[in-house]
A protein has these predicted regions:
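Short, low-complexity N-terminal intrinsically disordered segments enriched in polar/charged residues
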Residues: 25-53, 141-160
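Bacterial N-terminal signal peptides
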Residues: 11-22
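Exposed beta-sheet edge and beta->alpha loop/turn motif
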Residues: 97-149
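Short, surface-exposed loop or secondary-structure junction motifs
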Residues: 190-197, 250-449
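Short solvent-exposed beta->alpha transition segments
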Residues: 41, 49-101
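Short active-site loop at a secondary-structure junction
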Residues: 64, 170-178, 200-260, 299-310, ...
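Short, Gly/Ser/Thr-enriched beta-strand-loop segments that form substrate-interacting elements
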Residues: 97-113, 417-458, 466-469
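Short, conserved catalytic-motif segment at the N-terminal edge
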Residues: 153-212, 232-234, 294
């Protein structure tokens, strides 16, 4: 689950990937003499001045009124924390976006923390002294994968690459979690680093359960597909037909199950101040209906891709109405149980769940200290995210899914038919998808306070990578993507 605005987040994610992928040919770290470049220079000057109070007063003055107040407040807070903790920043890469020339990307490194961040900004054409788009996202050290090969590697070399990278991240205090790799038949890499609980210094190990954020959407999508197979609904059934209690029936009549699965419903997000001020009121899918219906519609259904946690909560309510079971019971019995996922489930914040790690987050990409994420999460996992699992269970899910144990092959093929363009690839029915070395990498990422996760499956071979972490949101999900690329390049042999 992502809390920040999808348009800003999508742009930031795309330019981050572009910046990281092309570091070898990085442009000189000189800010351009453009409106955005001049504003970036002022911003970095204020960060390096080291006066958080001054930054708090100044930063809002360069933001366009068109940026929503919550987004403004979030960006300003990141800048204040960066000013307080970074010890100043050095610019090490500057570039524009190839498809959006006005979009400026500025990669920096904190002098005190050594952490990296990417500023993403665009000046307002009508008011060039204001930023129409402004964000700061974390990024990994650009040199982290510099020595990684592009083609197939031996199993021993893969293990060496993974251990070296995890050790480097752990030594920099940038990774806490587990990473596992399957060759499609057996687990060939299984590594853990960091702490599951910091107060008592409890280490992560192979039994540790992690919240997995939006990986939960895959389980929700599979549950919907099972009900389609059973003839209890169709891909084209409307929200109005399946959830007649949804308050905004006029909108619901034009939204289909297919659109909800693909994030093309036009609905926004429930992560708004009202939700966080009243978290205890939102536990079951039906509890969210009024809140979701009150949020602005972002686009006409079927016309635009907008990542929507709200859409997946509504899918959870659809599962309940159609099956006659609670969403949580249905997924536990019809998805987790047949896949052999005995260590997966949904917990409430007051539950005692053995081996479940505590989530931690930083206030911004350049922040020095962590905080426990208790107050940043839903009271209970929802159909859009925050279930818990282990790497072993996630690999079991990937195998059961590919082998037709959860839905029939024809249904599975339909789920991946005609994905919607999104990011570096596309978004199918509950799964991200991209091509690498002529093969499909399918799965999902998850990132919210206290969680970073990724399941990446090389579909043609069954090889898969599971990464779980009790820190986030962070960019360590990219490590799983790098490994998936190596797996897609060819069979990993001993």
């Amino acid at each position: 689950m992502k809390r920040y605005s999808r348009p800003v987040a999508a742009s930031a994610s795309a330019v981050f990937l572009a910046c990281l992928a092309s570091v070898a040919g990085a442009a000189p770290a000189t800010l351009p003499d453009t409106a955005a470049g001049r504003l970036a220079g002022e911003l970095i000057h204020h960060v390096n001045a080291g006066n958080p109070d001054q930054m708090r007063r100044w930063a809002p003055t360069i933001l366009s009124a068109d940026i929503a107040p919550p987004e403004q407040a979030g960006f300003v807070q990141k800048l204040v924390v960066a000013t307080r903790d970074s010890g100043g920043v050095d610019v090490h890469d500057v570039r524009t976006h190839p498809r959006q020339p006005g979009l400026l990307q500025v990669a920096v490194k904190g002098r005190r923390t050594g952490r990296h961040a990417l500023f993403v900004m665009e000046a307002d054409p009508a008011k060039p002294d204001k930023l129409a788009l402004a964000d700061m996202v974390g990024m990994q050290d650009p040199s982290l994968y510099a020595a990684w090969p592009k083609g197939p590697v031996s199993q021993a070399e893969l293990q060496r690459l993974i251990n070296t990278t995890l050790d480097r991240l752990a030594q920099a205090d940038d990774f806490s979690g587990c990473l596992s790799v399957s060759d499609g038949k057996k687990t060939i890499v299984d590594e853990c680093r960091g702490l599951a609980e910091r107060n008592f210094g409890v280490a992560n190990d192979h039994r540790t359960r992690f919240h997995i954020g939006s990986l939960t959407k895959m389980f929700t999508a599979v549950a919907v597909a099972q009900l389609v197979e059973a003839g209890k609904l169709s891909w084209d059934s409307t929200l109005a037909q399946l959830v007649p209690e949804y308050p905004d029936q006029a909108t619901a009549r034009n939204i289909t199950v297919w659109q909800l699965l693909h994030h093309t419903s036009g609905l926004g997000d429930f992560f708004v101040p009202e939700f966080f001020q009243n978290r205890e009121q939102y536990v079951d899918p039906q509890d969210f209906l009024d809140l979701i219906a009150r949020q602005p519609v972002l686009s006409e259904p079927g016309k635009q891709w907008n990542y929507s946690n709200s859409g997946y909560v509504l899918l959870g309510r659809i599962i309940e109405n159609v099956s006659g079971e609670s969403y949580f019971d249905y997924v536990q019995q019809r998805v987790f149980a047949p896949a052999g996922m005995a260590d997966s489930g949904f917990d409430a914040i007051e539950d005692i769940t053995p081996n479940l790690s505590v989530g931690y987050f930083r206030d911004g990409p350049l922040a020095a200290e962590r905080k426990a994420a208790w107050m940043k999460l839903p009271v209970k996992g929802v159909p859009a995210g925050s279930s818990y699992s282990t790497n072993a269970d996630l690999l079991r899910f990937s195998r059961a899914l590919r082998e037709g144990e959860l839905v029939k092959p024809a249904t599975l093929a339909k789920m991946f038919d005609d994905p919607v363009p999104a990011g570096p690839g596309g978004y199918a029915a509950g799964f991200g998808e991209r091509l690498s070395h002529g093969r499909h990498i399918r799965g999902h990422t998850g990132g919210i306070e206290g969680t970073t996760a990724n399941l990446a499956i090389v579909w043609e071979t069954g090889a898969a990578v599971a990464l779980t972490s009790n820190e986030g949101p962070a960019e360590n999900w990219l490590l799983a993507e790098r490994i998936a690329d190596l797996l897609a390049a060819g069979t990993v042999k001993p």
